[in-house]
């Protein structure tokens, strides 16, 4: 059975080997989804959904998703942050700062609320742009 996850952390280091001192080959931004391919101790070898990069991340940084949740998130409308840093409010009380290009999964332009797993997030709609490839977003910047 396949395992899936999503990042609820602003930036996660994607490493070449399962070690904190290992070279960082890429970064996972808030809202990015991935498939978990292998687990060794506290490390998971993952493949990113968007760009298919592969590497190791600390298992503590993973919010697990069921296959249905994973498919629903990736089939739905997504928005991306368009400011250098944008603020989200987690569960009505915790500020979360996310960088440019972060994904807002299951974006609903009727409101300013989305959920990841059991957490609810609110945001300022002016901080995001919907239905745009992140590569095109860079060109607008």
Residue ranges and their predicted role:
Residues 1-3, 9, 19, 26, ...:
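Boundary regions of SH3-family modules and the immediately adjacent low-complexity/disordered segments
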